[in-house]
Amino acid sequence: AKVLVNDLGGAVDGSGGTAGAAQKVVDEIRAAGGEALANAASVTDFAAVEAMVQQAIDAWGRVDVLVNNAGILRDKSFAKMSMDDFRLVVDVHLMGAAYCCKAVWPHMVAQQYGRIVMTTSSTGLYGNFGQSNYGAAKLAQVGLMQTLALEGAKHNIHVNALAPTAATRMTEGLMPQEVLDALKPEAVVPAMLVLAHESAPTRTILCAGAGTFEAAHITLTQGVHLGIGSEVPEQLAVRLAEVTNRAGEQVPQSGAAQGTNEVAKAMTAR
């Protein structure tokens, strides 16, 4: 393996920083017989991210896999959260992932090969009290993944997302110790390896933790055509259970599926 390890080495809230965190992982990789380089740049700095990617290109000539896993936490209920804390979490998780993707993208297009893994979260997929900033950023990564997978298809660039549950510095204060003991980080690794492999799927959201693996989907129900008119709001309220009924739901192949479904129903109702 040839791995460039990026870690700002800061606290969980993003403050501070040291190159020691990345170097520790590099030392472990080298001890196992791999090649590795350390990088302590902040993923919120696009110029630094471009330099990081160039560091890998200079060393090994190409970048085959990108795993976006940089993250911080600044948890508070939304009512008590400052917008500075909201923005910083979004900048690290979402813009950091976008910057890294943007920096590797031309290299992957040129070599007609790439595998990108976004680290999303159950908080982004389903919500979690006190994590509005984190949840917004993590679900935004899924939207980025969906579109990049479509745009990358013709270049053999597969883009997926992984929602891990693992005991890390970021989660150790959120769960009791017996739960943390069950959530060994290495239990998530198989999911990441599958998504980064040459035979990886694309536009897939895998969930992993404690040895269990699931898939998450964003679906679209069959829906109900009610037309246009002053009576529609009341009709929608009455038939909302029918609209939200999941029987026959689909996993759209792109965002166009929603509009296609709606226009088809309108044409049929004529």
Give the label of every model feature segment.
Residues 126, 142, 147-157, 198-200:
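Active-site-adjacent segment of SDR/Rossmann-fold oxidoreductases
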Residues 121:
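Residue(s) in the substrate-gating loop at a strand-loop-helix junction
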Residues 161, 179-269:
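C-terminal helical subdomain
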Residues 101, 137:
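Active-site helix of classical SDR
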Residues 29, 77-78, 85-87:
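Substrate-binding pocket helix/loop in short-chain dehydrogenase/reductase
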Residues 19, 40-51, 83:
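The beta1-alpha1 cofactor-binding region of Rossmann-like NAD(H)/NADP(H)-dependent oxidoreductases
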Residues 32-35, 55-68, 74-77, 113, ...:
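A glycine-rich helix->loop->beta "capping" turn
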